[in-house]
Regions:
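Gram-negative bacterial Sec-dependent N-terminal signal peptides
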Residues: 1-25
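Conserved active-site regions of diverse hydrolases
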Residues: 3, 23-346, 353-362
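Short, glycine/charged-enriched secondary-structure capping and boundary segments
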Residues: 11, 15, 46-49, 142-146, ...
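A short hydrophobic/aromatic micro-motif that marks alpha-helical segments and, especially, helix-coil
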Residues: 18, 310-311, 606
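Membrane translocator/pore-forming domains, dominated by Gram-negative outer-membrane beta-barrels
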Residues: 346-621
């Protein structure tokens, strides 16, 4: 296959495509890159001219590569290793054979250089990015004409990449972004060479990717967190519908035929080592900078794509958190009935509606999310003896959640529970158990890819089971009563694994989740009783301290539908300790009918905020 060569006589550029900014990401402590020109942050440009004030990339300069864009989105700087940075990639580098006459390190040597500087250890909290293989193929097509020899060489190069990934894991790495090969047959260089070159480029890319994917499957099974990036599929999607992604040209280079993008800059620019120039705006509308390398806009799009994959487990993690709010509203209504039992209330039926505004704060692993929650609880309570009562209830909850930036989910929770209360003098104690089924619909993950907004949708099922013990003591002072209370509640929420409906490059699957909760509550309650005409009014207030012993960081496993490889990342992490406050007013309208209006709020919680209003009626027999 013919290739675009660097006119400065030294380098064969042999790579294809690469291509929200946040504070430093809490999931990772650094980003390290190994690869070729698709990820080269300036190493080759410094070989060509060590005096360069600004390093140049294989793109429409002064753009950045996809790997750099990923590092930036995570809050890190990825600079060339020749400047002391963590981007070891060199244009022309391969896994087995380089495709350049420049004195550069191949990709395995890049890893060895890094390990030599770290004492042979890879950092388990560092995110590694690996992208290569194209130069091996370019070397093979320049050296051989036998298709079988070329295919065998491509397979050997892919096996060398798998070996490198295994060596990274053996050195201690836990997280690696692995880019597969884009479709070489879709590059301007292949298009210009004719139909045979296009077909051959596509086929050899598939040979490489198939071997790589087999290795990825094995490495994922051995515990390496591989974040798969299907550039082959994504670039084909762009080529099939360029305008949707914001491109007007996907077949010719922005820098011109025969150009090399590492020495290509904007029209009229006199700074830098620029031998070629691209027209104004072409860096944003052309898919390719030169015969095989992506433009600035393409690199930006690829960075968005990678970040959508990395962030996806955080979106999914909120699903297992959501039912706890419905359970809390339900059990709050039930505990109020148990309090009434502690005062010797009659057999009755009751209904309560709770409207809650829930806000999950943004974290490095999950998005800011708002949820409007409505819960209806209906039940019946029977007075067995003067001191013993019990009841059953059913709860239907509907939550509509929206992620910041778009997307969200709907939760329908249907629960049943039973409870029993014993009271004697000023003391009371009770217990309850609950079980519920959850249905998540309209799960939507919104992804920005250049100008294109893609919505990945899914649905999932789940369930929860739990129970609690509560008790307290009343001190009576005429028309006032007050006293302490304590509750211990255990819940287990399970969400079944699910896959998004799409078959495109960004559609993903997510593993089964389990969120355990063990909340201890200590509080103080105050209640008054005053007659207002024919109505008995009972204002109340309570404040409580809560601690969830199981509110630990929880990882969600995910992967692409279209490519092997899986990874587990921590998503939403709830606070372990928070406060709650409740105030309200109940009224006895007749001997049989009473009602209440109340407010419940959550405070001193660094992970979420919750405010709700509840209203209810009960009818005694």
């Amino acid at each position: 296959m013919p290739r675009t060569r660097l006119i400065v006589g030294a380098i064969t550029s042999a790579l294809l495509f690469s291509s929200h900014a946040f504070a430093a990401d809490q999931r990772f402590n650094n980003v390290v890159v190994f690869g070729d020109s698709l990820s080269d942050a300036g190493n080759v440009s410094l070989i060509l001219d060590p005096a360069l004030q600004t390093t140049q990339r294989f793109t429409t300069n002064p753009g950045s590569t996809a790997a750099e864009n990923v590092a930036k989105a995570l809050g890190f700087s990825s600079t060339a290793s020749k400047l002391g940075g963590t981007d070891y990639a060199y244009g022309g580098a391969g896994f087995v054979n380089n495709a350049t006459t420049l004195p550069i390190e191949n990709i395995p040597q890049q890893l060895q250089q890094y390990l030599a500087a770290t004492g042979g250890k890879a950092d388990p909290r560092t995110l590694y990015q690996v992208w290569g293989g194209a130069n091996d193929i370019f070397y093979l097509t320049d050296t051989y004409t036998d298709a079988n020899v070329i295919a065998a060489g491509a397979a050997a190069a892919a096996q060398a990449e798998v070996k490198l990934l295994g060596n990274l894991q053996a050195a201690g790495a836990k997280y690696v972004v692995v880019y597969n090969l884009p479709d070489i047959g879709k590059t301007p260089e292949s298009i210009a060479a004719g139909a045979a070159a296009q077909s051959g480029g596509t086929q050899i890319s598939l040979v490489y990717n198939n071997v790589l994917q087999t290795g990825i499957t094995q490495l994922s099974g051995s515990g390496l967190n591989i974040i798969p990036v299907n550039t082959f599929a994504l670039i084909n999607e762009v080529v099939a519908n360029p305008s949707a992604f914001g491109f007007t040209n996907v077949t010719t280079p922005a820098c011109g035929a025969g150009s090399s993008s590492v020495v290509c800059g904007p029209a009229g620019s006199t700074s830098g080592l620029y031998l070629y120039h691209y027209p104004a705006g072409a860096d944003q509308t052309y898919l390719f900078a030169d015969g095989v390398h992506p433009s600035t806009a393409a690199d930006a799009m690829l960075g968005q794509y990678v970040m959508s994959i990395i962030n996806a487990p955080g979106y999914a993690s909120l699903l297992a958190e959501a039912p706890l709010a419905s359970i809390s509203a339900q059990n709050r209504a039930i505990r109020n009935q148990m309090l009434a039992d502690g005062q010797g209330s009659d057999t009755r039926v009751f209904a309560s509606i709770d409207y809650g505004d829930q806000r999950f704060d943004a974290m490095s692993g999950s998005p800011k999310t708002t949820s409007n929650n409505v819960n209806l609880t209906i039940g019946a309570d029977v007075r067995f003896t003067d001191n013993l009562s019990g009841g059953v209830a059913m709860n239907v909850g509907q939550h509509n959640a929206d992620y910041s930036g778009g997307g969200g989910y709907k939760l329908q929770d249907i629960s049943g529970l039973g409870y029993v209360t014993y009271h004697q003098g000023g003391g009371y104690i009770g217990g309850y158990v609950d079980f519920g089924q959850d249905n998540f619909s309209d799960i939507e993950r919104r992804i920005q890819l250049g100008n294109y907004v893609r919505n990945e949708t899914a649905k999932a099922d789940g369930n929860h089971m739990g129970g609690g013990v509560t008790g307290g003591w009343w001190f009576d002072f005429s028309s006032l009563r007050t006293g302490p209370f304590a509750t211990v509640e255990w819940q287990t929420v399970k969400v079944d694994g699910y896959s998004e409906n799409g078959i495109d490059s960004s559609a993903m699957w997510f593993s089964r989740q389990q969120r355990d909760s063990l909340v201890s509550t200590l509080g103080w309650r105050l209640e008054g009783h005053w007659q207002a005409g024919n109505t008995m009014l009972s204002p109340y207030a309570e404040i409580a301290w809560n601690h969830d012993d199981k509110a630990d960081p929880r990882a969600v496993t995910a992967g692409l539908n279209s490519m092997p490889g899986s990874f587990s990342l921590v998503g939403f992490t709830p606070d372990k300790t928070w406060g709650t406050a409740d105030v309200g007013l109940s009224a006895q309208f007749t001997q049989a009918l009473s009602g209440w209006l109340g407010y419940s709020g959550r405070f001193s919680d660094n992970s979420q905020k919750y405010n709700s209003v509840n209203v209810g009626l009960k009818y005694a027999f």
